[in-house]
């Protein structure tokens, strides 16, 4: 039990208490369901691969998005991780291609550009099909560092590719009086004409 609790505790969002609760729930689960869950975890590692084009996890290579002939080849949405790609895709409003960096620059944590999927992105841009690269990162220091690095790389090596980023500011349904100062600053900087 302790071994399982420790392993579950390594997952994001699992502290010692939630890992213990999950382990106990697995113990109470009928044997067939627990074995099915274990099989699903094994299948996750065995059956998924990284798409050779966009670096997303998929059951096939190329992934369904890269294989879709109806997607726009001229626009790539650059995301830090698979979670971000899934969120963008669930919205149903982006019809271009994606590229997953596999993280963000985090010098304090020892994550530099060599650990990100920048070389495959560079290879895609070198083909000359892409006209715009949309940076879909959050508003963290790591996101800012990554955005700056990518923007500089593209400006230096692929000046014909426009670089844009998702707008930042006050979320829909929020009130100004409840916003932190940085969100208000970003909202003012990125204000739009009506």
Residue ranges: model-predicted function:
Residues 58-60, 71:
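Short functional micro-motifs and their immediate structural scaffolds
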Residues 44-47, 59:
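Short metal-coordination and nucleic-acid-contact micro-motifs, chiefly zinc-binding Cys/His arrays
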Residues 3, 94-95, 122-194:
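Long C-terminal interaction/binding lobes of large macromolecular proteins
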Residues 24, 82-83, 103-105, 138-140, ...:
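Short, ordered loop/turn segments at secondary-structure junctions
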Residues 1-12:
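Extended, structured, electrostatic nucleic-acid-contact surfaces
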Residues 19, 68-137:
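Extended interfacial segments that mediate partner engagement and assembly in macromolecular machines
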Residues 51-54, 63-66:
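Short cysteine-rich clusters marking metal-coordination/redox-active sites
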């Amino acid at each position: 039990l302790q071994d399982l609790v420790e392993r579950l505790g390594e997952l994001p969002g699992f502290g010692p208490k939630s890992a213990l609760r999950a382990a106990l729930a697995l113990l109470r689960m009928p044997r067939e369901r627990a074995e099915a869950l274990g099989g699903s975890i094994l299948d996750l590692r065995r059956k998924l691969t990284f798409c050779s084009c966009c670096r997303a996890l998929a059951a096939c290579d190329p992934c369904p998005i890269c294989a879709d002939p109806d997607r726009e080849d001229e626009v790539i949405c650059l995301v830090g991780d698979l979670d971000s790609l899934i969120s963008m895709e669930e919205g149903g409003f982006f019809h271009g291609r994606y590229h997953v960096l596999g993280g963000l620059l985090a010098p304090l944590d020892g994550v530099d550009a060599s650990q990100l999927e920048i070389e495959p992105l560079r290879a895609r841009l070198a083909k000359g099909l892409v006209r715009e690269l949309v940076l879909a990162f959050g508003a963290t220091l790591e996101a800012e560092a990554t955005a700056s690095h990518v923007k500089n790389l593209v400006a230096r090596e692929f000046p014909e590719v426009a670089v844009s980023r998702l707008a930042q500011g006050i979320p829909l349904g929020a009130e100004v009086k409840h916003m932190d100062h940085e969100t208000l600053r970003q909202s003012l900087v990125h204000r739009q004409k009506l």
